[in-house]
Protein backbone atom coordinates (compact mmCIF):
# COMPACT_ATOMS: atom_id res chain seq x y z
CA UNK A 1 0.00 0.00 0.00
CA UNK A 2 1.27 3.48 -0.87
CA UNK A 3 2.28 6.04 1.75
CA UNK A 4 -0.57 8.51 2.17
CA UNK A 5 -0.26 11.77 4.10
CA UNK A 6 -3.29 13.44 5.64
CA UNK A 7 -3.00 17.09 6.68
CA UNK A 8 -5.48 18.46 9.22
CA UNK A 9 -5.47 21.67 11.23
CA UNK A 10 -6.25 20.27 14.68
CA UNK A 11 -5.99 16.82 16.22
CA UNK A 12 -9.58 17.01 17.46
CA UNK A 13 -10.81 17.13 13.87
CA UNK A 14 -9.53 13.58 13.31
CA UNK A 15 -9.51 12.30 16.90
CA UNK A 16 -11.92 9.48 16.16
CA UNK A 17 -9.57 8.15 13.49
CA UNK A 18 -6.22 8.54 15.23
CA UNK A 19 -7.14 7.71 18.84
CA UNK A 20 -4.84 4.66 19.00
CA UNK A 21 -2.28 5.64 16.39
CA UNK A 22 1.44 5.97 17.04
CA UNK A 23 2.41 9.53 18.01
CA UNK A 24 5.77 10.76 16.73
CA UNK A 25 7.51 14.13 17.14
CA UNK A 26 9.96 15.18 14.42
CA UNK A 27 11.82 18.34 13.54
CA UNK A 28 11.68 20.10 10.19
CA UNK A 29 12.98 23.54 9.24
CA UNK A 30 13.57 24.43 12.88
CA UNK A 31 10.06 23.55 14.00
CA UNK A 32 8.63 20.62 15.92
CA UNK A 33 5.80 18.69 14.30
CA UNK A 34 3.57 15.96 15.70
CA UNK A 35 2.71 13.12 13.34
CA UNK A 36 0.23 10.32 13.92
CA UNK A 37 1.13 7.08 12.17
CA UNK A 38 -0.50 3.78 11.40
CA UNK A 39 0.79 1.47 8.69
CA UNK A 40 1.31 3.41 5.49
CA UNK A 41 -0.81 6.38 6.58
CA UNK A 42 0.51 9.43 8.42
CA UNK A 43 -1.50 12.38 9.74
CA UNK A 44 0.07 15.80 10.24
CA UNK A 45 -1.87 18.28 12.38
CA UNK A 46 -0.14 21.53 11.58
CA UNK A 47 -2.46 24.20 12.96
CA UNK A 48 -5.11 26.60 11.67
CA UNK A 49 -4.59 28.77 8.61
CA UNK A 50 -2.68 28.90 5.36
CA UNK A 51 0.80 29.36 6.81
CA UNK A 52 0.40 26.54 9.31
CA UNK A 53 -0.99 24.23 6.63
CA UNK A 54 1.85 25.07 4.25
CA UNK A 55 4.46 24.27 6.89
CA UNK A 56 2.78 20.99 7.81
CA UNK A 57 2.41 19.94 4.18
CA UNK A 58 6.06 20.68 3.41
CA UNK A 59 7.19 18.84 6.53
CA UNK A 60 5.20 15.69 5.83
CA UNK A 61 6.27 15.66 2.17
CA UNK A 62 9.98 15.97 2.98
CA UNK A 63 9.99 13.63 5.97
CA UNK A 64 7.64 10.90 4.71
CA UNK A 65 7.76 11.11 0.89
CA UNK A 66 4.04 10.37 0.45
CA UNK A 67 2.52 9.40 -2.87
CA UNK A 68 -0.71 11.24 -2.07
CA UNK A 69 -1.57 14.31 0.00
CA UNK A 70 -5.06 14.66 1.49
CA UNK A 71 -6.37 17.82 3.16
CA UNK A 72 -9.10 17.08 5.70
CA UNK A 73 -10.91 18.95 8.44
CA UNK A 74 -13.72 21.35 9.25
CA UNK A 75 -15.37 23.72 6.78
CA UNK A 76 -18.16 26.25 6.79
CA UNK A 77 -21.13 25.81 4.45
CA UNK A 78 -21.67 28.47 1.80
CA UNK A 79 -24.98 27.06 0.60
CA UNK A 80 -28.08 26.29 2.71
CA UNK A 81 -28.27 22.72 1.39
CA UNK A 82 -25.19 21.72 3.39
CA UNK A 83 -25.67 20.88 7.06
CA UNK A 84 -23.43 20.05 10.01
CA UNK A 85 -21.89 16.62 9.51
CA UNK A 86 -22.21 16.65 5.72
CA UNK A 87 -19.06 15.74 3.82
CA UNK A 88 -17.71 17.50 0.76
CA UNK A 89 -15.10 15.93 -1.52
CA UNK A 90 -13.75 18.89 -3.46
CA UNK A 91 -13.21 18.75 -7.20
CA UNK A 92 -11.42 22.10 -7.12
CA UNK A 93 -9.82 24.13 -4.34
CA UNK A 94 -9.77 27.90 -4.77
CA UNK A 95 -7.41 30.30 -3.01
CA UNK A 96 -9.51 33.37 -2.18
CA UNK A 97 -6.42 35.59 -2.09
CA UNK A 98 -5.81 35.45 -5.85
CA UNK A 99 -8.44 33.15 -7.33
CA UNK A 100 -5.91 30.45 -8.20
CA UNK A 101 -7.28 26.93 -8.36
CA UNK A 102 -6.02 23.41 -7.80
CA UNK A 103 -8.08 20.79 -9.59
CA UNK A 104 -8.46 17.30 -8.21
CA UNK A 105 -7.97 15.02 -11.19
CA UNK A 106 -10.52 12.24 -11.47
CA UNK A 107 -13.07 13.94 -9.22
CA UNK A 108 -16.56 12.82 -10.20
CA UNK A 109 -18.42 15.82 -8.80
CA UNK A 110 -18.57 19.59 -9.13
CA UNK A 111 -17.89 20.60 -5.53
CA UNK A 112 -15.79 23.74 -5.16
CA UNK A 113 -14.04 24.54 -1.89
CA UNK A 114 -12.63 28.01 -1.28
CA UNK A 115 -9.85 28.69 1.21
CA UNK A 116 -10.13 32.00 3.04
CA UNK A 117 -7.45 33.62 5.18
CA UNK A 118 -9.59 34.13 8.27
CA UNK A 119 -12.66 32.80 10.05
CA UNK A 120 -15.65 33.55 7.80
CA UNK A 121 -18.79 35.02 9.32
CA UNK A 122 -22.23 34.90 7.71
CA UNK A 123 -21.69 37.96 5.49
CA UNK A 124 -18.27 36.78 4.38
CA UNK A 125 -19.74 33.37 3.52
CA UNK A 126 -22.27 35.12 1.29
CA UNK A 127 -19.49 37.13 -0.35
CA UNK A 128 -17.39 34.02 -1.01
CA UNK A 129 -20.34 32.09 -2.42
CA UNK A 130 -21.08 34.98 -4.79
CA UNK A 131 -17.46 35.54 -5.82
CA UNK A 132 -16.43 31.94 -6.39
CA UNK A 133 -19.57 29.83 -6.58
CA UNK A 134 -18.07 27.51 -3.98
CA UNK A 135 -20.05 25.21 -1.72
CA UNK A 136 -17.85 25.45 1.38
CA UNK A 137 -15.00 27.44 2.91
CA UNK A 138 -11.98 26.35 4.92
CA UNK A 139 -8.67 27.91 5.96
CA UNK A 140 -6.05 25.36 4.87
CA UNK A 141 -6.80 23.33 1.74
CA UNK A 142 -5.33 25.78 -0.80
CA UNK A 143 -1.96 25.72 0.95
CA UNK A 144 -1.92 21.91 1.04
CA UNK A 145 -2.93 21.80 -2.63
CA UNK A 146 -0.16 24.24 -3.57
CA UNK A 147 2.44 22.07 -1.83
CA UNK A 148 1.13 18.97 -3.59
CA UNK A 149 1.23 20.64 -7.00
CA UNK A 150 4.75 21.99 -6.35
CA UNK A 151 6.01 18.49 -5.56
CA UNK A 152 3.98 16.71 -8.23
CA UNK A 153 1.98 14.72 -5.69
CA UNK A 154 -1.67 13.74 -6.18
CA UNK A 155 -3.97 15.80 -4.00
CA UNK A 156 -7.47 15.46 -2.57
CA UNK A 157 -9.57 17.43 -0.11
CA UNK A 158 -12.36 16.09 2.07
CA UNK A 159 -14.07 18.47 4.46
CA UNK A 160 -16.92 18.13 6.92
CA UNK A 161 -19.37 20.93 7.59
CA UNK A 162 -19.02 22.24 11.14
CA UNK A 163 -20.97 25.48 10.74
CA UNK A 164 -23.88 26.12 8.40
CA UNK A 165 -24.20 29.07 6.05
CA UNK A 166 -26.46 31.04 8.42
CA UNK A 167 -24.49 30.27 11.60
CA UNK A 168 -22.58 33.26 12.95
CA UNK A 169 -19.45 32.02 14.64
CA UNK A 170 -18.29 33.73 17.85
CA UNK A 171 -15.20 35.91 17.62
CA UNK A 172 -12.44 33.34 17.15
CA UNK A 173 -9.70 34.79 14.94
CA UNK A 174 -8.02 36.61 17.82
CA UNK A 175 -7.53 33.28 19.62
CA UNK A 176 -5.45 31.72 16.83
CA UNK A 177 -1.76 32.28 17.54
CA UNK A 178 0.94 32.78 14.84
CA UNK A 179 1.69 29.04 14.90
CA UNK A 180 -1.92 28.23 14.04
CA UNK A 181 -2.77 26.94 17.52
CA UNK A 182 -6.16 27.74 19.00
CA UNK A 183 -5.94 29.23 22.49
CA UNK A 184 -8.83 27.29 23.97
CA UNK A 185 -8.45 28.52 27.56
CA UNK A 186 -8.39 32.16 26.45
CA UNK A 187 -11.47 31.66 24.29
CA UNK A 188 -13.30 29.88 27.12
CA UNK A 189 -12.64 32.80 29.47
CA UNK A 190 -13.70 35.30 26.80
CA UNK A 191 -16.98 33.43 26.23
CA UNK A 192 -17.64 32.86 29.94
CA UNK A 193 -17.67 36.61 30.55
CA UNK A 194 -20.20 37.20 27.75
CA UNK A 195 -23.50 35.44 28.52
CA UNK A 196 -24.98 36.44 25.17
CA UNK A 197 -22.43 34.10 23.52
CA UNK A 198 -23.18 31.04 25.63
CA UNK A 199 -25.87 29.56 23.38
CA UNK A 200 -23.70 29.93 20.28
CA UNK A 201 -20.65 28.46 22.01
CA UNK A 202 -22.62 25.46 23.24
CA UNK A 203 -24.04 24.91 19.76
CA UNK A 204 -20.59 25.31 18.22
CA UNK A 205 -19.19 22.64 20.53
CA UNK A 206 -22.02 20.25 19.68
CA UNK A 207 -21.57 20.92 15.97
CA UNK A 208 -17.83 20.28 16.24
CA UNK A 209 -18.41 16.93 17.94
CA UNK A 210 -20.90 15.89 15.27
CA UNK A 211 -18.52 16.97 12.52
CA UNK A 212 -15.61 15.10 14.09
CA UNK A 213 -17.63 11.89 14.28
CA UNK A 214 -18.75 12.15 10.67
CA UNK A 215 -15.27 12.89 9.35
CA UNK A 216 -13.59 10.20 11.45
CA UNK A 217 -16.10 7.55 10.36
CA UNK A 218 -15.56 8.48 6.73
CA UNK A 219 -11.78 8.45 7.05
CA UNK A 220 -11.75 5.11 8.85
CA UNK A 221 -13.53 3.52 5.90
CA UNK A 222 -11.29 5.38 3.46
CA UNK A 223 -8.12 4.16 5.17
CA UNK A 224 -9.44 0.59 5.16
CA UNK A 225 -10.10 0.82 1.43
CA UNK A 226 -6.76 2.39 0.49
CA UNK A 227 -5.12 -0.88 -0.47
CA UNK A 228 -7.90 -1.51 -3.00
CA UNK A 229 -7.84 1.94 -4.60
CA UNK A 230 -5.80 2.52 -7.73
CA UNK A 231 -3.11 5.20 -7.74
CA UNK A 232 -4.66 8.67 -8.21
CA UNK A 233 -3.56 11.16 -10.83
CA UNK A 234 -1.71 14.29 -9.75
CA UNK A 235 -3.70 17.45 -9.20
CA UNK A 236 -3.27 20.32 -11.63
CA UNK A 237 -3.43 24.02 -10.99
CA UNK A 238 -4.56 27.12 -12.80
CA UNK A 239 -5.26 30.78 -12.12
CA UNK A 240 -8.72 32.20 -12.69
CA UNK A 241 -9.90 35.44 -11.17
CA UNK A 242 -13.52 34.91 -12.00
CA UNK A 243 -15.95 32.97 -9.82
CA UNK A 244 -17.90 29.85 -10.69
CA UNK A 245 -17.73 26.14 -9.94
Where are these regions (language model features)?
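Short, conserved "active-site rim" segments that organize catalytic pockets and cofactor/ligand binding
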Residues: 2-21, 87
Amino acid sequence: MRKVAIVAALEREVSGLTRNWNRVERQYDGRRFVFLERGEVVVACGGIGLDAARRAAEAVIVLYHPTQLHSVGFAGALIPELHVGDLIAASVVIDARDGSRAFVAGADNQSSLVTYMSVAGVQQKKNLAHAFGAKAVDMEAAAVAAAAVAHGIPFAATKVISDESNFELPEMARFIDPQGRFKTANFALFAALRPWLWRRVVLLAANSRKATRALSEHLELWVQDLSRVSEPVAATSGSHAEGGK
